[in-house]
Regions:
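Structural preference for solvent-exposed beta-strand-turn elements
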Residues: 1-194
Length: 194
């Protein structure tokens, strides 16, 4: 969005089944020309010579994907763009872009300044703690099992499954906690109960 060329975004069957109007609508409010296919992918983002305009967008439902789309589009918009979250969602985009988040009561307000140029840099993407949960469960119920997983993302917005498993008696240890690219990561060691 906001670039002088047209782009068509497609996806696999799973992605094409997801609703895209909830992402397209706030981008249209910013001035983007977006056409969906019956509200789904593929979608075409039309090029244009008019830059996007910053907006304040209140998420009608909790969605980290919509929030990220608006914030990333806001980087190339005129003025500032603010996303208001009535309920907190995953905060990977804010961490990656090092954005300040203002807490107003129970709400989170995240603002980006327009016409911001991103610098190229190298990123390390942590392993997905949601995918690791299956192995944590397996090791927790298999007799004499021990499993170690290195470099797992431990973003507090994604670790509830580990908390629940611990509460159920799973022996989950986190070692080597560190931060990479603004994201907390660590190594998981899971042992079957004695």
């Amino acid at each position: 969005a906001g670039r002088p060329f047209a782009t068509t975004l497609v996806g696999d069957a799973s992605l094409s089944a997801r609703p895209m109007e909830r992402i397209a609508e706030p981008l249209r409010q910013m001035g983007a020309c977006i056409e969906t296919t019956d509200g789904h992918a593929p979608l075409t983002v039309g090029g244009g010579s008019t830059p996007l305009s910053g907006i304040t967008y209140r998420l009608p439902v909790a969605s980290a994907q919509v929030k990220s789309a608006v914030l990333l589009a806001g980087l190339s918009a005129r003025g500032s763009t603010t996303v208001v979250e009535p309920v907190a969602t995953r905060d990977h985009t804010e961490r990656m872009l090092e954005l300040p988040v203002l807490h107003v009561g129970a709400e989170r307000h995240t603002t980006v300044d327009g016409n911001t140029r991103l610098r190229a840099r190298q990123w390390i993407v942590p392993r997905d703690v949601s995918a690791a949960a299956f192995f944590v469960v397996a090791a927790s119920i298999a007799e004499h099992a021990i499993i170690e997983m290195h470099g797992v993302g431990l973003n507090p917005t994604r670790t509830a499954a580990l908390d629940v498993l611990r509460a159920m008696g799973a022996r989950v240890a986190i070692v080597g906690e560190r931060e990479v690219g603004g994201e907390p990561i660590g190594d998981l060691r899971v042992e079957a109960p004695e």
